[in-house]
């Protein structure tokens, strides 16, 4: 059953790819522009930690970078090969891992930590964490020898 579900997911992604490519077929965003924009975006995320805002929209980020939402969407989907939310959530997961390594956060619940990292719900945090890391947040905390309140 699990294998069938996985195969359906793979087939679904294969069907989506041509749709995404068709959407950007007439794009005039250059590789050089993507490289530059990706660098600016990474610097912005590391310096300003925009990902901790759970309400951050792609339009907000595009305005900060002074590009269109189309260009930013192209950057994520074609150049970085991930969607906007996966990009943000990757930073949020790294933030979570950074926080749980600090003793001062050991009294926080997982939900509170997830919110500090920018996740808007416990469910989306748990789902994405397990998808990316392969274990639950609780299992991760135990694996690094820490404890928390949940």
Located regions from the model:
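Membrane-proximal linker segments that couple transmembrane helices to downstream signaling/catalytic modules
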Residues: 2-112, 116, 128-131, 138-150
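The DNA-contacting recognition helix of HTH DNA-binding domains
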Residues: 69, 121-123
